[in-house]
Amino acid sequence: MNKSQQAGFTLIELVMVIVILGVLAAVALPKFVNVDDDAKQAAVNGVAGALSSASAINYASRKANSGKGNSVANCTDVANSLQGGLPTGYVITAAAITPADTTKTDCVVTANSKTANFTATSIN
């Protein structure tokens, strides 16, 4: 008498695997949902860093040769020094930089309800 053996998983084993995968998904999903907010903040921080760098480079260029660079009297003027301009959807809060020459001030850039500060240096 030959008894054939069947290979495979039992129903209980399959159900347990599905339950374990469900628990793992429930634990991991909230971590991936918040990544979107972190990415938006990182993008705004990157633009703020680029604006700070553009302001410093513009200041050095204009100080070395008054014919180069852009005059900066308020925070929004820094966008003119940024190569390619300010990206679409980003807004710089207008704030005067006083006194008018060689003063550093903190400015704010906003996009997607996220904000970041950057340093602007005024120069005539």
Could you tell me what each predicted segment is?
Residues 1-9:
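N-terminal leader/signal peptides at the extreme start of proteins
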Residues 33-47:
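Aliphatic-rich helix starts adjacent to a transmembrane/signal segment
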Residues 4, 18-21, 45:
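Short glycine- and Lys/Arg-enriched binding-loop motifs that mark or flank ligand-binding interfaces
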Residues 53-124:
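Periplasmic/extracellular, small/polar-rich flexible segments of pilin-like filament-forming proteins
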Residues 15-31:
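Alpha-helical hydrophobic helix detector
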